[in-house]
Amino acid sequence: MTEAQRHQILLEMLAQLGFVTVEKVVERLGISPATARRDINKLDESGKLKKVRNGAEAITQQRPRWTPMNLHQAQNHDEKVRIAKAASQLVNPGESVVINCGSTAFLLGREMCGKPVQIITNYLPLANYLIDQEHDSVIIMGGQYNKSQSITLSPQGSENSLYAGHWMFTSGKGLTAEGLYKTDMLTAMAEQKMLSVVGKLVVLVDSSKIGERAGMLFSRADQIDMLITGKNANPEILQQLEAQGVSILRV
């Protein structure tokens, strides 16, 4: 039975009963409790049911709600999926990773969910997803909630060394031979504090961002350990980055 078929049957159960438990879904569909909870989570995120403790409730009207689960709507979605998959393969069991905000970041977090790695993030949609999926080790960086970016930002001068990771994965609005550019200054400044305490900095940007310069310079090219991007990225820019010691992976 496919996921789509399971979802259809689950919604039909709710239409008849109004409420179903995880145990009832397991019994009806012949699936594991983890799969049942995952199906309920996905249908909740898409507004087709309401997730409640130990089950789900029917809703009379679907909620028009955008969440990171609607990533198929993101620009260059397929390329970002490939980038996220490639990035996840860099991390070894037992390591810790810092993942920042954005659609590619969420895709990466989804790829790593369930693996024996510690995920450090200030991106609340990703943190909520990891908690819902019962990922073993999640650290949420503290600070003031920034509604526009759905992240937490720590006060100026606060100590971030507690959040040092083996890897830091980040993206931006543009990448040139000079380095990575970000447009949100507060977010960029908060992330910059961590550059000196992470093991390796990996930039994840789709090919449309290569050669673009927008906002503030977040990190110089010589601070970047690796770039993962699409196959259509500007080859001239990639050569200039390689000359400065940046490892390039095109997917």
Curated annotation (Swiss-Prot):
Q: Which residues form the HTH deoR-type domain?
A: 3-58
Q: Which cysteines are joined by disulfide bonds?
A: none
Subcellular location per the Swiss-Prot or TrEMBL entry: Cytoplasm
State if RNA-binding is listed as a keyword.
no
Which species expresses this protein natively?
Escherichia coli (strain K12)
Where's the DNA-binding part? 20-39
Matching entries from InterPro entries are given as: Carb_Metab_HTH_regulators, DeoR-like_C, DeoR_HTH, NagB/RpiA_transferase-like, Tscrpt_reg_HTH_DeoR_CS, Tscrpt_reg_HTH_UlaR, WH-like_DNA-bd_sf, WH_DNA-bd_sf
Q: Could you state one GO biological process linked to this protein?
A: negative regulation of DNA-templated transcription
HAMAP family found in the cross-reference section? HTH_type_UlaR
Q: Name one GO cellular component term.
A: cytoplasm
Phenotype upon gene inactivation: Cells lacking this gene show a more rapid utilization of L-ascorbate and are able to grow on L-ascorbate under microaerophilic conditions.
Q: Check the record and name the PROSITE patterns matching this protein.
A: HTH_DEOR_1, HTH_DEOR_2
The UniProt function text for this chain reads: Represses ulaG and the ulaABCDEF operon. Two ulaR binding sites have been identified in each promoter. Full activity requires simultaneous interaction of UlaR with both divergent promoters and seems to be dependent on repressor-mediated DNA loop formation, which is helped by the action of integration host factor.
Q: Which NCBIfam families match?
A: PRK13509.1
Alphabetically list the UniProt keywords: Cytoplasm, DNA-binding, Repressor, Transcription, Transcription regulation
MF-aspect GO terms: cis-regulatory region sequence-specific DNA binding; L-ascorbic acid binding; ligand-modulated transcription factor activity
What's the protein here called?
Answer: HTH-type transcriptional regulator UlaR
